[in-house]
């Protein structure tokens, strides 16, 4: 695998997913948490979040070793990433990026830093994620969209493991989760799905519909447990054997996604919508 640059391809495409008020939904590069809350929890999860600077835009990533972060492959543009700010605050440490290694098929990328970060790192979730499990999404999209100086988080419940999601890459195997207490908007691409303080998924896509109130209420995550060997090979990270087996794979075209009803706006400090590519 080389560190050659990757030309970003828009993942936006109309998808026949199920929603009470929006039968046509786009699965687009997933995006900032709006109407959410500041990242909380252990210092491990809050310190490990990374804001990746990509020209005039940004993505989110997660530190998994002192020198390696993981993010979405579609976040890596032609020419690469300029730098990374590590931690949940804009006062976090900043480093230039040495290289980015792209997964050959999945929407994953590994970003190497030249120096060890002083932040904590996270372990991969030790089991294959199952429907019904609850976790937290975290991201830096609010920094660009709303001027938030602290990374934001929302709650996610995994609904199913899917393939054939209406998008350019119908072969992608993804964890589909509904988002509550916040919504995904541009800038959270590549961000973590934490379960029990460990990294279970990397954000790849989110809903993008005509009714803005439904945007970002469903996210699709790359299941990192299914790519543990690739991650360990390039980063040198020790990864314990993954427990259990992957959940049943559901065809998302034959069995369309259910989009939950829009949540009421709470008037939090990051209200409003900023929709577009990451």
From Swiss-Prot:
Its main location: secreted. It comes from the Bacteria. Disulfide bonds join 59-75. It holds the Pfam family Trypsin. Keywords: Disulfide bond, Hydrolase, Protease, Secreted, Serine protease, Signal. Transmembrane segments: none annotated. GO terms for biological process: proteolysis. Residues 33-236 form the Peptidase S1 domain. One of its GO terms (cellular component) is extracellular region. One of its GO terms (molecular function) is serine-type endopeptidase activity. It is found in: Secreted. Residues 1-32 form the signal peptide. The active site is at 74 (charge relay system), 123 (charge relay system), 189 (charge relay system). Gene3D superfamilies: Trypsin-like serine proteases (2.40.10.10). Belongs to the peptidase S1 family. PANTHER family: FI18310P1-RELATED, POLYSERASE-RELATED. This is Putative peptidase Cgl1093. The lineage of its organism: Bacteria, Bacillati, Actinomycetota, Actinomycetes, Mycobacteriales.
């Amino acid at each position: 695998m080389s560190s050659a640059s990757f030309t970003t391809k828009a993942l936006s495409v109309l998808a026949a997913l199920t929603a009470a008020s929006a039968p046509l939904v786009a699965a687009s590069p997933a995006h900032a948490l709006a109407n959410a809350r500041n990242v909380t929890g252990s210092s491990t999860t809050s310190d490990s979040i990374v804001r990746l600077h990509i020209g005039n835009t940004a993505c989110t990533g997660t530190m998994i070793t002192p020198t390696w972060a993981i993010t979405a492959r579609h976040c890596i543009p032609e020419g690469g990433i300029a730098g990374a700010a590590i931690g949940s605050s804009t006062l976090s440490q900043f480093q230039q990026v040495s290289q980015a290694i792209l997964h050959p098929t999945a929407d994953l990328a590994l970003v190497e830093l030249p120096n060890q970060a002083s932040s904590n790192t996270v372990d991969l979730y030790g089991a294959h994620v199952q429907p019904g499990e609850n976790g937290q999404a975290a991201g830096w999209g609010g920094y660009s969209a709303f001027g938030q100086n602290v990374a934001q988080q929302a709650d996610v419940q995994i609904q199913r493991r899917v393939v054939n999601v209406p998008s350019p890459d119908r072969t992608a195997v993804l964890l589909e989760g509904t988002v509550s207490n916040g919504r995904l908007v541009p800038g959270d691409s590549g961000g973590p799905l934490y379960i029990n303080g460990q990294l279970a998924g990397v954000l790849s896509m989110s809903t993008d519909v005509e009714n803005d109130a439904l945007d970002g209420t469903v996210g699709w995550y790359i299941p990192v447990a299914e790519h543990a060997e690739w991650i360990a090979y390039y980063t040198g990270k020790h990864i314990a054997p993954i427990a259990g087996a992957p959940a049943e794979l559901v065809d998302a075209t034959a069995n369309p996604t259910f989009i939950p009803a829009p949540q009421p706006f709470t008037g939090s400090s990051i209200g409003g919508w900023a929709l577009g590519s990451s």
